[in-house]
Amino acid sequence: MTDLSDIRREYTKGGLRRADLPQNPMQLFELWMTQARDAELSDPTAMCVATVDEHGQPYQRIVLLKRFDDTGFVFFTNLGSRKAQQIAANNKVSLHFPWHSIERQVSILGEAQPLSTAEVLKYFMTRPKDSQIAAWVSQQSSKLSARQVLEGKFFEMKAKFAKGDVPLPSFWGGYLVKPSSIEFWQGGEHRLHDRFLYTRQADEWVIDRLAP
């Protein structure tokens, strides 16, 4: 077994105090996202999306956040993917943003609701054409005999859609994750990290400080 117990560092970039918290967690998330982008982090919108299968086995994957507002967090995916199939059976999910270099993380619990076709199409039309074509090519999570099969299909579809717009695949969609709780974690000196949990109760958010 590889021993990693000596790998550690101090967290010194700041603190988080109750008096500084807005009542709406989305305002704090917007501030932190802006600061993560300003800090030029690699992929600040990358989040871990966790789902579970019918046996309670959890699965995780990195997905890009594409939009957020007071209603929740939006991402897009192939509707034939493992994540989409699991969401169809159990729409309770968790999201996690690991912003290591600024010593912050955000953890979200909520329910994923499918977006309308109009909402999906609106975003799909903003994607680069090659990305639109790639959405047609990959049967996400299915087994492939070789990469060449995928590449061959890509160039086949690229020729097919060489002229005009690429239509929206019927098997491609998106989700709005409506949060029931959002936890903000700020690294602190001596492992005395700051953690605040926002929990939705009816139309309000209750804020609790958690022990690190």
Curated annotation (Swiss-Prot):
Cofactor note: Binds 1 FMN per subunit.
Binding, FMN: 61-66, 76-77, 82-83, 105, 140-141, 185, 195
Record-listed E.C. numbers: 1.4.3.5
Keyword set includes Oxidoreductase: yes
GO molecular-function term, one example from the UniProt record: pyridoxamine phosphate oxidase activity
Gene Ontology annotations of biological process type: pyridoxine biosynthetic process
Enzyme superclass (EC): oxidoreductase
Record pathway: Cofactor metabolism; pyridoxal 5'-phosphate salvage; pyridoxal 5'-phosphate from pyridoxamine 5'-phosphate: step 1/1; Cofactor metabolism; pyridoxal 5'-phosphate salvage; pyridoxal 5'-phosphate from pyridoxine 5'-phosphate: step 1/1
SUPFAM superfamilies from the UniProt entry: FMN-binding split barrel (SSF50475)
Gene3D superfamilies assigned to the protein according to its UniProt record, in alphabetical order: Electron Transport, Fmn-binding Protein, Chain A
Catalytic activity: pyridoxamine 5'-phosphate + O2 + H2O = pyridoxal 5'-phosphate + H2O2 + NH4(+); pyridoxine 5'-phosphate + O2 = pyridoxal 5'-phosphate + H2O2
Keywords noted in UniProt: Flavoprotein, FMN, Oxidoreductase, Pyridoxine biosynthesis
Keyword Plastid found: no
One Pfam family named in its UniProt record: PNP_phzG_C
Cofactor(s) required for function per UniProt: FMN
Function noted in UniProt: Catalyzes the oxidation of either pyridoxine 5'-phosphate (PNP) or pyridoxamine 5'-phosphate (PMP) into pyridoxal 5'-phosphate (PLP).
Record text on subunit structure and interactions: Homodimer.
UniProt xrefs under HAMAP family: PdxH
Similarity comment: Belongs to the pyridoxamine 5'-phosphate oxidase family.
Protein's recorded name: Pyridoxine/pyridoxamine 5'-phosphate oxidase
Naturally occurring in which organism (per UniProt): Shewanella sp. (strain MR-7)
